[in-house]
């Protein structure tokens, strides 16, 4: 698992990256009440808006940690947005992206680096 400073995570299997938000981000948002995930076929660049998550506190963009084509959005979140709070780093994923440039992963943090980053906030 790799992480961004915007609190997204990515897990790569082969050439497919599964993307979500971290437990820290979910905790900061509070109770998630709405999620808009991308549709298959959407092409995203690293750092661009990928999804939207709304909570009782705020609406936030979820940014693509990698570039590529969305092959699946997690449609189950529309009917069960609370999954983002309950399972932020597993079942609460937002999208699966076919990687365009695997080298982008090198710029992301591993868990130890991410936890050290959280310590600076």
From Swiss-Prot:
Requisite cofactors: (R)-lipoate
Modified residues (N6-lipoyllysine): 57
InterPro entries on file: 2-oxoA_DH_lipoyl-BS, Biotin_lipoyl, GCV_H, GCV_H/Fam206, GCV_H_sub, Single_hybrid_motif
Gene3D superfamilies (UniProt xref): 2.40.50.100
GO cellular component: cytoplasm; glycine cleavage complex
Paired cysteines (S-S): none
GO biological process: glycine decarboxylation via glycine cleavage system
Cofactor binding comment, as recorded: Binds 1 lipoyl cofactor covalently.
UniProt KW keywords: Lipoyl
A Pfam short name: GCV_H
Subunit structure: The glycine cleavage system is composed of four proteins: P, T, L and H.
Function text: The glycine cleavage system catalyzes the degradation of glycine. The H protein shuttles the methylamine group of glycine from the P protein to the T protein.
Protein name: Glycine cleavage system H protein
């Amino acid at each position: 698992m790799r992480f961004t400073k915007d609190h997204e995570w990515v897990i790569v299997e082969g050439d497919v990256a599964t993307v979500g938000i971290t437990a820290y981000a979910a905790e900061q948002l509070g109770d998630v009440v709405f999620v808009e995930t991308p549709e298959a076929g959407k092409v995203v660049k690293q750092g661009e808006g990928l999804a939207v998550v709304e909570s009782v506190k705020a609406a936030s963009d979820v940014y693509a940690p990698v570039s590529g084509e969305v092959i699946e959005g997690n449609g189950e979140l529309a009917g069960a947005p609370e999954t983002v709070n309950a399972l932020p780093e597993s079942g609460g994923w937002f999208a699966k992206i076919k990687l365009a440039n695997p080298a982008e992963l090198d710029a992301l943090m591993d868990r130890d680096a991410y936890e050290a980053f959280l310590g600076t906030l």
